[in-house]
Design a protein with these regions (language model features):
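Surface-exposed extracellular loop regions of Gram-negative outer-membrane beta-barrel proteins
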Residues: 76-83, 87, 93, 98, ...
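Beta-turn initiation residues at beta-strand->coil junctions
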Residues: 1-8, 12, 18-25, 31, ...
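Intrinsically disordered, low-complexity Ser/Thr- and acidic-rich flexible linkers and loops
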Residues: 70-72, 76, 169-194, 254-273
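Catalytic toxin/effector domains delivered as secreted proteins or via bacterial secretion systems
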Residues: 404-526
């Protein structure tokens, strides 16, 4: 298998500044990241003369994003946000087309009016079930938010709540929640035009029989990461690094090695597994956002929107080879190029072209109905709208693992954990402490430093303030930071030693600067 070496470089504040991918043959792929004083990414410069720029409002929301190469202008959008931090409108800077969004009283996304004047509804009812019509009459739901019927299909489930049949045939069961089981004497077989779903005992999707009769099968490891997909005589294999897919390849199923179990119970592969059509995905360090696709010696740069969703891909010559927008369900629209050239959708989701389902680690999401096809494995702890529902607003929120809505986590703590762990692994700085108290005489009781670090190069101590999801410092915090930066702050008695072993307790902050790190929600790991 081809070895790709991905290297990450950081600035003196411990922030990612460069990504380099080298496979030993051909040119390297690179990304350079330029930030503003708050640590927000304002420009990215990629191999092939590709650039992406962003501007932000005072709350950290992206208000414009543009990409271009030496050959052509690319993605150009202007964003407007309402007082609640919800996306209000998007204007295409090239065509002038405008998309506007509407929300209900609790902030759930209800609809979009696209640039061509068409309306797309995602109308939630009081329990969180969503409908594609304004009057909410196009669907019928059962317990827990399972969809029973829409304008095209009936949906049938097993006793565990997993979807087992999506069929255009009507009235196949009289069960109030469309449950079908052998025990109850109701077993319905697949017919042409149906989608049939089979499940493993642990709740993972095993296979899907498509309307024309072919079957897609899936395999997983013990962590729920999909390792293989089998379809139409081909094996599609996946390799993971933690929670992100880093490589995939395919070959003919007839060439797949057999497995055996030795006398110690170990699984052995008989022969070498073929590796053909290898694709390598490159991510920014610590995130789920893909930034490059490496295939057959070609290097493709991936541009993502303010949420981290892919919206554009360039080849190494600076030509746009893929581009897309998203609808209110997270499905693609305005597609240019081959749909599955970039298979990533909402963060944590990978689209299967055969089924049009999004693999979302522990569940599969159907963007055509806006629901998962099985119940949340952690049930009510997931805090999603229903047991089958996706997030309330896919313009802002996401569900990385098909378990829970990211915004329902303690964002500040998660952001601090991310930056703290990043800094621990940064060889250019020493982490002195976390939640270190600094007194600010004359301005309140002082403040805590989220993370206190010291640069190995300059010896300067940096008070790192961490914000998540566009949060900003209060006026009081800014005043205290100004005092700290001017040397007027005093380290409290719980202060650590500096990297030379000198106690900082009761010392003035004469060698300290304050720095804000704003972590977008999509860069926060679970």
């Amino acid at each position: 298998m081809s070895q790709l070496v991905v290297q990450y470089s950081f600035d003196e504040d411990g922030l990612l500044s460069r990504v380099t991918a080298a496979n030993g043959g051909g040119e390297n792929w690179e990304e350079e990241i330029i930030r503003d004083s708050e640590g927000l990414k304002i420009e990215k410069i990629f191999s092939g003369g590709i650039r992406m720029t962003r501007t932000y409002d005072a709350y950290g929301n992206v208000i414009s994003q543009k990409s271009r190469s030496f050959r052509q202008d690319g993605y150009d959008r202007r964003y407007a946000w309402n007082a609640s931090g919800r996306l209000q409108s998007v204007i295409d800077g090239i065509t002038g087309g405008r998309t506007s969004y509407a929300y209900d009283a609790v902030g759930s996304l209800m609809s979009a009016r696209y640039e061509d004047g068409t309306d797309d509804y995602r109308m939630p009812d009081a329990t969180g079930n969503v409908f594609r019509s304004r009057d909410r009459r196009d669907r019928e739901y059962g317990k827990g938010g399972r969809i029973l019927r829409d304008r095209h299909y009936d949906f049938l489930y097993d006793v565990e709540g997993n979807l087992i049949l999506k069929t255009p045939r009507r009235g196949l069961t009289q069960h109030p929640n469309h449950e079908v089981s052998e025990e109850s004497g109701t077993h319905i077989v697949w017919q042409t035009g149906d989608y049939a779903y089979e499940w493993y005992g642990n709740g993972m999707l095993k296979e899907v029989r498509l309307p024309y009769g072919k079957t897609v099968r899936f395999e997983y490891d013990a962590l729920g990461r999909r390792t293989a997909k089998l379809f139409n005589g081909h094996v599609f294999r996946y390799l993971w690094d933690g929670n992100v897919m880093v490589q995939e390849w395919q070959y003919e199923e007839k060439d797949r090695p057999q497995y055996s179990i030795d006398e110690f119970g170990r699984i052995r592969m008989q022969g070498e597994e073929p590796v053909e059509n290898l694709v390598t995905w490159v991510y920014e360090e610590g995130s789920y956002v893909p930034v490059a696709k490496i295939q057959n010696g070609e290097r493709y740069t991936i541009i993502s929107d303010y949420m981290g969703r892919p919206v554009e891909a360039y080849n190494s010559y600076g030509n746009v080879v893929w581009q897309a927008d998203y609808d209110v369900y997270g499905d693609l629209r305005n597609i240019k190029g081959i749909r599955d050239f970039i298979p990533f959708r909402q963060l944590g989701q990978y689209e299967d072209d055969e089924t049009r389902l999004y693999y979302n680690r522990f569940r599969y999401y159907d963007p055509r109905i806006g629901n998962y096809i099985s119940q949340d494995p952690i049930r009510l702890a997931g805090n999603n709208p229903t047991l089958y529902g996706y997030v309330e607003d896919c313009n802002k929120l996401f569900d990385l693992f098909g378990l829970d809505c990211k915004a329902n986590k303690k964002q500040g703590t998660l952001a601090e954990d991310k930056i703290y762990n990043d800094l621990l692994h940064n060889s250019d700085v020493i982490v002195l402490g976390r939640q270190v108290y600094i007194k600010t005489p004359g301005i309140g009781r002082g403040r805590y430093s989220d993370v206190l670090i010291q640069s190995k190069k300059t010896g300067k101590i940096i008070n790192v303030e961490i914000k998540s999801g566009g949060a900003v410092r209060s006026t009081s915090q800014i005043k205290k930071d100004i005092l700290i930066n001017s040397g007027g702050g005093v380290f409290g008695k719980n202060a650590p030693l500096d990297m030379n072993g000198k106690p900082l307790a009761d010392m003035k902050t004469s060698n300290v600067t304050s720095s804000v790190r704003n972590v977008p929600l999509w860069e926060i790991n679970m």
